[in-house]
Curated annotation (Swiss-Prot):
Disulfide bonds join 42-162. Keywords: Disulfide bond, Glycoprotein, Secreted, Signal, Vasoactive, Vasoconstrictor. GO terms for biological process: positive regulation of epithelial to mesenchymal transition; regulation of apoptotic process; regulation of systemic arterial blood pressure by renin-angiotensin; vasoconstriction. This is Angiotensinogen.
Length: 477
């Protein structure tokens, strides 16, 4: 590893260690200087706001209007270009934002998993989408709403001083950098093991005006921002169907935007859509579906992937679970966490998906493994209003939002959603060194044919991209 990269890794690990000690069970950690306004930017803001004219606005096109399709390849190329231009400070800022997203999402996940534990399906959470959505709302927020959003993002607003305020543009740019660092890996060799696309949908009532600087700022995080208008007042189910048809038409993704529970007088739905596709090197799709045991007496037939290689692995005899690290690239990996007994899934989830859970990665060691696991195609949506309430964080996404930087209209937020389309598939090219058939030691047969947990993690960026629970691969909740 080059010296500069090693220095960055050491700095990040020191920040993580310090933050873990300082944070304890609290959500909030120290506001790192890389993500807040400095004195020079505060002076520029003061000058810009002095005698500043009203921000230009526009009315989103009707959702029925013809739209150009989203070019996912172009989105990936743009992320790769972003990653190539990052300097050392940019990478450290990206790591800092990734760490903040990890802390927030572990807290949300640990509280919300109590609800998920009662559901026999598959659930998935995107730390980057959660953090990115809240940061996007912060970009459009003013006064008490901005204050409370900043606190939830992990950077308390100490006083009225500008230099303690989160810089939304820095945060959103850092989130795009985190995405770019993931998809840029292995591109030099012409390989594309990972695809990650983020699209923001801004759905408004007819006649509502959005401010152009806000929408332009969102492009720092998600290059594809789709503002559209439609009627929410007559039938929310019909409105949800229109949104879903529109998104499938422009992206090709079959995802849902559930509006159940939203008020009929809502005039804004904010949805962050994420598509992830990971190709597992040296794995192949088995010819026939295999049994997956949902519980001791119930099984379902699911497509399975199979691969053999030398993977990082650890089995905890005391708490009775195992962890296997399957590489996507040199830095990015899939972490598979399986209880020794299916009935212990909730217990193992509580042990592993928490703020200091990545400490057990130091215990992993090479092991020859023949791994069989479900081919995952997961689609799920969740409402951040529900997640924040479950996590006992301030309920700030309701009717009292101050979003003056987003619109001059009185915004009534119906839903703040994240919709995830997650795919794991086989990459049946020639096996790489880590996935070639092992020689020598006895091969461990590892079959994930009962409930398990997973995470997508980048070791260099110390960023978690997805946290998931699979109790039944055929059902997403």
């Amino acid at each position: 590893m080059p010296p500069a990269s090693m220095s960055l890794r050491v700095t990040i690990l020191c920040l993580l260690a310090w933050a873990g000690l300082a944070a304890g069970d609290r959500v909030y950690i120290h506001p790192f200087h890389l993500v807040i306004h400095n004195e020079s930017t505060c002076e520029e803001l003061a000058k810009a706001n002095a005698g500043k004219p009203e921000d230009p606005t526009f009315t989103p096109a009707l959702i029925q209007a013809k739209s150009l399709p989203v070019d996912e390849k172009a989105l990936q190329d743009q992320l790769v270009l972003v990653a190539a231009k990052l300097n050392a400070e940019d990478k450290l800022r990206a790591a800092t934002v990734g760490m903040l997203a990890n802390f927030l999402s572990f807290h949300i996940y640990s509280m919300h998993s109590e609800l998920w534990g009662m559901v026999q399906g598959a659930t998935i959470l995107s730390p980057m989408a959660v953090f990115g959505t809240l940061a996007s709302l912060y970009l459009g927020a003013s006064n008490h709403t901005a204050y409370r959003l900043q606190a939830i993002l992990g950077v308390p607003w100490k006083d009225e001083n500008c230099t303690s305020r989160l810089d939304a543009h820095k945060v959103l740019s850092a989130l795009q950098a985190v995405q770019g660092l993931l998809v840029a890996q292995d591109r030099a060799e012409g390989q594309t093991q990972l695809l990650l696309s983020t699209v923001v949908g801004l759905f408004t009532a007819p006649g509502l005006h959005l401010k152009q600087p806000f929408v332009q700022g969102l492009a720092l995080y998600a290059p594809a921002v789709l503002p559209r208008s439609l009627d929410f007042s007559t039938d929310l189910d019909v409105a949800a169907e229109k949104i879903d048809r529109f998104m499938q038409a422009v992206t090709g993704w079959k995802v849902s935007s559930p509006l159940t529970g939203a008020s009929a007088d809502s005039n804004l739905v904010f949805n962050t859509y994420v598509h992830f596709q990971g190709k597992m090197k040296g794995f192949s799709l088995l010819a026939e579906p295999q049994e997956f045991w949902v519980d001791n007496s119930t099984s379902v037939s699911v497509p399975m992937l199979s691969g053999m290689g030398t993977f990082q692995h650890w089995s905890d005899a005391q708490d009775k679970f195992s962890v296997t690290q399957v590489p996507f690239t040199e830095s990015a990996c899939l972490l598979l966490i399986q209880p020794h007994y299916a009935s212990d899934l909730d217990k193992v989830e509580g042990l592993t998906f928490q703020q200091n859970s990545l400490n057990w990665m130091n215990k992993l060691s090479p092991r020859a493994i023949h791994l069989t696991m479900p081919r995952l195609v997961l689609r799920g949506s969740y409402d951040l209003q529900d997640l924040l309430a479950q996590a006992e964080l301030p309920t700030i996404l309701g009717t009292e939002l101050n979003l003056q930087k987003m619109s001059n209209n009185n915004l009534r937020v119906g839903k703040v959603l994240n919709s995830i389309f997650f795919e794991l598939e086989a990459d049946e090219k020639e096996p790489t060194e880590s996935t070639q058939q092992p020689k020598g030691p006895e091969v461990l047969e590892l079959n994930l044919n009962h409930p398990f947990l997973f995470a997508v993690y980048d070791q260099d960026a110390t960023a978690l991209y997805f946290l998931g629970r699979v109790a039944n691969p055929l059902t997403t909740v």
